[in-house]
Amino acid sequence: MNKELTAMIFDIQSYSVHDGPGCRTNVFFVGCPLQCRWCANPESWKLKKHLMFADRTCKWDQGCKACIDACPHGSITFDADGRPSVNWVICNECETIECVNSCAAGSLKQCVRILTVDDLMKILKRDFSNWGAEGGVTFSGGEPLLQHEYLDEVLQRCHQLQMQTAIETSGYARQDVFLKIFRNIDFAFIDVKNMDDELHKWGTGVSNE
């Protein structure tokens, strides 16, 4: 029996008018082989769960310290003003994230969702009627090609349902992966970082050769 495909997704934006023609649903994948100095979504680099802290809803001023008590690593403490301070170096390596379940205010959340292909298709089918003639779905990230087996299955299902597909990618993947995915892509934004190899390594951390 084949294992059901899943992907790590850190955001899904419905009713977007960016990243492709018309009204769109943008799906942001976790994980990227590049680490661009100018990246707008550095929280998406690592292919793992991530923690998000919303200070504005935190009940620290009402004496709550549930997350501090729950954290087994001591990575959440009070600063000099009595506000919770998160040690992101430790938290970004945490696999269990006990603090999330302890937070009654919902100020601590996992900003990564584990979705099956059926899960994502259910969302896209829900949004489909709002896209209009020019709209569709855009796969972004992170780098969507990093989770290519899942993406390939989703793209095939999208085309079976006559959904227009787009991708935002650096193109940083094996040739066979690139060609496989682009069989079912209608519109592509390919972000070439720099043609000079040394500048590419300086800006992204990897060679372009």
Model-predicted regions and their roles:
Residues 1, 7-9, 52, 114, ...:
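Radical SAM enzyme [4Fe-4S]-AdoMet core and its adjacent flexible, acidic
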Residues 2-42, 46-50:
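N-terminal cysteine/histidine-rich coordination modules
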Residues 12, 42, 88-89, 111, ...:
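Fold-independent oxyanion-binding glycine-rich loops
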Residues 26-39, 51-75, 83-106, 112, ...:
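Cysteine-centered iron-sulfur cluster-binding motifs in ferredoxin-type domains/subunits
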Residues 49, 81-82, 94, 111, ...:
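Residues at secondary-structure transition points
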Residues 75-84, 99, 108-119, 123-134:
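Fe-S ferredoxin-like electron-transfer domains
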Residues 105-112, 198-204:
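Acidic/glycine-enriched edge-of-secondary-structure segments
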Residues 118-209:
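Conserved AdoMet/S-adenosylmethionine-binding subsite of the radical SAM
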